[in-house]
Amino acid sequence: MIKVGIIGTGVMGAGHARFIKEHVPDATVVGLSDIDTKKIAELSAELGTVLFSTTNPEELMNDSRVDAIIIASPDPLHVPHLRLAIASGKQILCEKPIATTLEDARMISAEIRTYQERVGKKMINFGFMRRFDPCYQEVRRLIATGDFGPPTFFRTVTRNVASTGATTTGLFTNIAIHDFDIYRWLFKDEWESIQSFYPRRSSLSPDGLADPLIIIGRLKSGVTMVGDVVAFNNYGFDCRVEVICEKGSIQIGTHGDVIT
Protein backbone atom coordinates (compact mmCIF):
# COMPACT_ATOMS: atom_id res chain seq x y z
CA MET A 1 0.00 0.00 0.00
CA ILE A 2 1.42 3.37 -1.06
CA LYS A 3 0.94 5.97 1.66
CA VAL A 4 0.37 9.42 0.19
CA GLY A 5 0.78 12.87 1.70
CA ILE A 6 -0.91 15.82 0.00
CA ILE A 7 0.27 19.44 0.13
CA GLY A 8 -2.73 21.69 -0.44
CA THR A 9 -6.37 20.80 0.19
CA GLY A 10 -8.03 23.10 -2.34
CA VAL A 11 -9.80 22.01 -5.52
CA MET A 12 -6.91 19.99 -6.95
CA GLY A 13 -5.57 18.57 -3.69
CA ALA A 14 -9.02 17.46 -2.55
CA GLY A 15 -9.69 16.08 -6.04
CA HIS A 16 -6.57 13.92 -5.94
CA ALA A 17 -7.47 12.71 -2.46
CA ARG A 18 -10.99 11.68 -3.50
CA PHE A 19 -9.73 9.98 -6.64
CA ILE A 20 -7.23 7.94 -4.63
CA LYS A 21 -9.94 6.91 -2.18
CA GLU A 22 -12.42 5.89 -4.89
CA HIS A 23 -10.21 4.52 -7.68
CA VAL A 24 -6.74 3.54 -6.42
CA PRO A 25 -7.01 0.45 -4.21
CA ASP A 26 -3.26 0.14 -3.63
CA ALA A 27 -2.84 3.70 -2.29
CA THR A 28 -4.23 5.64 0.66
CA VAL A 29 -3.98 9.25 1.82
CA VAL A 30 -2.37 9.34 5.27
CA GLY A 31 -1.27 12.97 5.60
CA LEU A 32 -2.52 16.45 4.68
CA SER A 33 -0.87 19.86 4.84
CA ASP A 34 -2.48 23.26 4.37
CA ILE A 35 -2.54 26.63 6.12
CA ASP A 36 -6.35 26.33 6.20
CA THR A 37 -7.00 23.98 9.12
CA LYS A 38 -10.74 24.02 8.44
CA LYS A 39 -10.19 22.55 4.97
CA ILE A 40 -7.87 19.94 6.45
CA ALA A 41 -10.48 18.92 9.01
CA GLU A 42 -13.26 18.68 6.42
CA LEU A 43 -11.21 16.60 3.97
CA SER A 44 -9.84 14.37 6.74
CA ALA A 45 -13.37 13.59 7.90
CA GLU A 46 -14.45 12.82 4.33
CA LEU A 47 -11.52 10.49 3.61
CA GLY A 48 -11.42 8.61 6.90
CA THR A 49 -7.83 7.45 6.29
CA VAL A 50 -5.77 10.47 7.37
CA LEU A 51 -3.36 9.68 10.21
CA PHE A 52 -1.97 13.17 10.70
CA SER A 53 -2.11 16.74 9.39
CA THR A 54 0.07 19.81 9.65
CA THR A 55 0.34 23.41 8.50
CA ASN A 56 4.04 22.79 7.79
CA PRO A 57 4.58 21.07 4.41
CA GLU A 58 8.19 20.14 5.23
CA GLU A 59 6.97 18.23 8.27
CA LEU A 60 4.61 16.16 6.11
CA MET A 61 7.26 15.46 3.48
CA ASN A 62 9.76 14.18 6.02
CA ASP A 63 7.30 12.05 7.96
CA SER A 64 8.21 8.35 7.78
CA ARG A 65 4.55 7.43 7.36
CA VAL A 66 4.51 9.07 3.89
CA ASP A 67 5.84 7.18 0.84
CA ALA A 68 4.81 9.61 -1.91
CA ILE A 69 3.92 13.29 -2.10
CA ILE A 70 1.33 15.18 -4.15
CA ILE A 71 2.01 18.92 -4.47
CA ALA A 72 -1.26 20.76 -5.07
CA SER A 73 -0.39 24.04 -3.39
CA PRO A 74 -0.90 27.47 -5.04
CA ASP A 75 1.19 27.91 -8.21
CA PRO A 76 3.81 30.30 -6.71
CA LEU A 77 4.66 27.66 -4.07
CA HIS A 78 5.40 24.83 -6.50
CA VAL A 79 9.13 25.58 -6.78
CA PRO A 80 9.86 25.80 -3.02
CA HIS A 81 7.68 22.77 -2.34
CA LEU A 82 9.39 20.80 -5.11
CA ARG A 83 12.76 21.57 -3.52
CA LEU A 84 11.55 20.34 -0.14
CA ALA A 85 10.07 17.22 -1.73
CA ILE A 86 13.30 16.47 -3.60
CA ALA A 87 15.21 16.75 -0.32
CA SER A 88 12.86 14.15 1.21
CA GLY A 89 13.87 11.58 -1.43
CA LYS A 90 10.27 10.49 -2.04
CA GLN A 91 8.18 9.98 -5.18
CA ILE A 92 6.48 13.22 -6.22
CA LEU A 93 3.44 14.20 -8.28
CA CYS A 94 3.32 17.98 -8.76
CA GLU A 95 0.41 19.86 -10.24
CA LYS A 96 1.14 22.11 -13.17
CA PRO A 97 2.61 24.62 -13.69
CA ILE A 98 6.12 23.68 -12.61
CA ALA A 99 6.77 27.39 -11.91
CA THR A 100 5.28 30.82 -12.53
CA THR A 101 8.30 32.34 -14.30
CA LEU A 102 10.49 31.04 -17.12
CA GLU A 103 13.63 31.59 -15.04
CA ASP A 104 12.28 29.51 -12.14
CA ALA A 105 11.02 26.82 -14.52
CA ARG A 106 14.45 26.40 -16.10
CA MET A 107 16.17 26.41 -12.72
CA ILE A 108 13.93 23.81 -11.04
CA SER A 109 13.92 21.66 -14.21
CA ALA A 110 17.71 21.50 -14.06
CA GLU A 111 17.55 20.56 -10.37
CA ILE A 112 15.02 17.80 -11.14
CA ARG A 113 17.20 16.38 -13.92
CA THR A 114 20.25 16.38 -11.66
CA TYR A 115 18.30 14.69 -8.87
CA GLN A 116 16.86 11.96 -11.10
CA GLU A 117 20.23 11.28 -12.72
CA ARG A 118 21.75 10.92 -9.26
CA VAL A 119 19.16 8.41 -8.02
CA GLY A 120 19.00 6.64 -11.39
CA LYS A 121 15.23 6.66 -11.89
CA LYS A 122 12.24 8.90 -12.52
CA MET A 123 11.02 10.34 -9.23
CA ILE A 124 8.87 13.29 -10.29
CA ASN A 125 5.78 13.51 -12.50
CA PHE A 126 3.46 16.40 -13.32
CA GLY A 127 -0.31 16.57 -13.68
CA PHE A 128 -0.55 15.93 -17.41
CA MET A 129 -3.19 13.20 -17.40
CA ARG A 130 -4.05 13.25 -21.11
CA ARG A 131 -0.98 11.12 -21.87
CA PHE A 132 -2.71 8.29 -19.99
CA ASP A 133 -6.08 8.71 -21.73
CA PRO A 134 -6.76 5.70 -24.02
CA CYS A 135 -8.11 8.01 -26.75
CA TYR A 136 -4.95 10.11 -26.92
CA GLN A 137 -2.83 6.96 -26.78
CA GLU A 138 -4.77 5.59 -29.76
CA VAL A 139 -4.31 8.85 -31.71
CA ARG A 140 -0.57 8.71 -31.02
CA ARG A 141 -0.48 5.10 -32.24
CA LEU A 142 -2.42 5.95 -35.42
CA ILE A 143 -0.13 8.88 -36.23
CA ALA A 144 2.92 6.65 -35.73
CA THR A 145 1.61 4.01 -38.19
CA GLY A 146 1.96 6.48 -41.05
CA ASP A 147 -1.24 5.12 -42.61
CA PHE A 148 -2.75 8.61 -42.75
CA GLY A 149 0.36 10.24 -44.17
CA PRO A 150 2.33 13.03 -42.51
CA PRO A 151 0.31 15.38 -40.25
CA THR A 152 -0.06 18.93 -41.56
CA PHE A 153 -2.09 20.72 -38.88
CA PHE A 154 -4.48 20.08 -36.02
CA ARG A 155 -7.44 21.74 -34.30
CA THR A 156 -8.07 21.60 -30.57
CA VAL A 157 -10.90 22.50 -28.22
CA THR A 158 -10.43 22.77 -24.44
CA ARG A 159 -13.52 24.23 -22.77
CA ASN A 160 -14.18 24.02 -19.04
CA VAL A 161 -17.60 24.39 -17.45
CA ALA A 162 -16.55 26.85 -14.73
CA SER A 163 -12.92 27.38 -13.78
CA THR A 164 -13.44 28.97 -10.37
CA GLY A 165 -10.61 31.32 -9.49
CA ALA A 166 -9.26 31.38 -13.06
CA THR A 167 -7.02 34.25 -14.11
CA THR A 168 -6.00 35.42 -17.56
CA THR A 169 -2.50 34.06 -16.96
CA GLY A 170 -4.04 30.88 -15.56
CA LEU A 171 -5.73 30.14 -18.89
CA PHE A 172 -2.21 29.43 -20.12
CA THR A 173 -0.57 27.92 -17.04
CA ASN A 174 -3.48 25.79 -15.82
CA ILE A 175 -5.69 25.01 -18.84
CA ALA A 176 -3.90 25.53 -22.18
CA ILE A 177 -0.80 23.94 -20.69
CA HIS A 178 -2.51 20.55 -21.21
CA ASP A 179 -2.61 21.28 -24.95
CA PHE A 180 1.02 22.43 -25.01
CA ASP A 181 2.08 19.18 -23.34
CA ILE A 182 -0.07 16.62 -25.12
CA TYR A 183 0.85 17.71 -28.64
CA ARG A 184 4.57 17.56 -27.90
CA TRP A 185 3.84 14.00 -26.81
CA LEU A 186 1.49 13.07 -29.66
CA PHE A 187 3.83 14.26 -32.40
CA LYS A 188 7.12 13.54 -30.58
CA ASP A 189 8.10 17.12 -31.38
CA GLU A 190 8.84 20.44 -29.69
CA TRP A 191 7.16 23.82 -30.01
CA GLU A 192 8.77 26.43 -32.24
CA SER A 193 6.30 29.25 -31.55
CA ILE A 194 2.98 29.93 -29.83
CA GLN A 195 0.78 33.01 -30.28
CA SER A 196 -2.42 33.96 -28.49
CA PHE A 197 -5.38 36.15 -29.39
CA TYR A 198 -8.39 37.29 -27.40
CA PRO A 199 -11.78 37.43 -29.14
CA ARG A 200 -14.75 39.27 -27.65
CA ARG A 201 -14.91 38.49 -23.93
CA SER A 202 -17.69 36.14 -22.84
CA SER A 203 -20.36 37.70 -20.63
CA LEU A 204 -20.29 34.44 -18.63
CA SER A 205 -16.72 35.11 -17.49
CA PRO A 206 -15.93 37.03 -14.27
CA ASP A 207 -14.87 40.66 -14.58
CA GLY A 208 -11.18 41.02 -15.32
CA LEU A 209 -10.82 37.60 -16.94
CA ALA A 210 -9.86 37.56 -20.64
CA ASP A 211 -11.87 34.52 -21.70
CA PRO A 212 -11.97 32.81 -24.21
CA LEU A 213 -8.46 32.46 -25.62
CA ILE A 214 -7.42 31.58 -29.19
CA ILE A 215 -4.03 29.92 -29.72
CA ILE A 216 -1.99 29.42 -32.89
CA GLY A 217 1.13 27.32 -32.50
CA ARG A 218 3.78 25.75 -34.69
CA LEU A 219 5.88 22.69 -33.93
CA LYS A 220 9.47 22.42 -35.16
CA SER A 221 8.37 19.97 -37.86
CA GLY A 222 6.04 22.63 -39.29
CA VAL A 223 2.83 20.99 -38.04
CA THR A 224 0.55 23.86 -36.98
CA MET A 225 -2.11 24.11 -34.27
CA VAL A 226 -5.24 26.23 -34.09
CA GLY A 227 -7.06 25.92 -30.78
CA ASP A 228 -9.40 27.59 -28.35
CA VAL A 229 -9.49 27.60 -24.56
CA VAL A 230 -12.61 28.56 -22.61
CA ALA A 231 -12.71 28.84 -18.82
CA PHE A 232 -16.48 29.36 -18.47
CA ASN A 233 -18.36 27.27 -21.03
CA ASN A 234 -22.11 27.32 -20.49
CA TYR A 235 -23.02 24.07 -22.28
CA GLY A 236 -20.56 21.80 -20.42
CA PHE A 237 -17.04 20.38 -20.54
CA ASP A 238 -15.80 19.96 -24.10
CA CYS A 239 -12.40 18.57 -25.08
CA ARG A 240 -11.75 17.58 -28.71
CA VAL A 241 -8.94 17.32 -31.22
CA GLU A 242 -8.69 16.73 -34.96
CA VAL A 243 -5.36 15.87 -36.58
CA ILE A 244 -5.37 16.55 -40.32
CA CYS A 245 -2.91 14.39 -42.27
CA GLU A 246 -2.16 14.17 -45.98
CA LYS A 247 -4.32 11.05 -46.46
CA GLY A 248 -7.03 11.53 -43.85
CA SER A 249 -7.90 12.86 -40.42
CA ILE A 250 -7.99 11.48 -36.88
CA GLN A 251 -10.43 12.90 -34.34
CA ILE A 252 -11.27 12.54 -30.69
CA GLY A 253 -14.97 13.35 -30.63
CA THR A 254 -17.23 14.91 -28.04
CA HIS A 255 -17.95 11.53 -26.45
CA GLY A 256 -14.32 10.41 -26.25
CA ASP A 257 -14.51 8.30 -29.40
CA VAL A 258 -11.63 8.10 -31.88
CA ILE A 259 -12.87 8.78 -35.43
CA THR A 260 -10.82 8.25 -38.59
Regions found by a protein language model. Name each.
Residues 99-163:
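A contiguous active-site-proximal alpha/beta segment in oxidoreductase catalytic domains
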Residues 1-47:
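N-terminal Rossmann-like dinucleotide-binding module
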Residues 71, 94, 100, 124-126, ...:
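Hydrophobic residues in well-ordered beta-strands that form the structural core
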Residues 50-51, 88-90, 115-122, 223:
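A short helix->loop->beta-strand "cap" motif at the edges of active sites that frequently abuts
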Residues 161-224, 229-238:
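Rossmann-like dinucleotide-binding domain that binds NAD(P)(H)
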Residues 27-31, 67-69, 170:
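Short active-site oxyanion
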Residues 129, 241-260:
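C-terminal glycine/acidic-rich active-site capping loop/insertion
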Residues 16, 49-111:
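Beta-loop-alpha module in the N-terminal Rossmann-like domain of NAD(P)-dependent dehydrogenases
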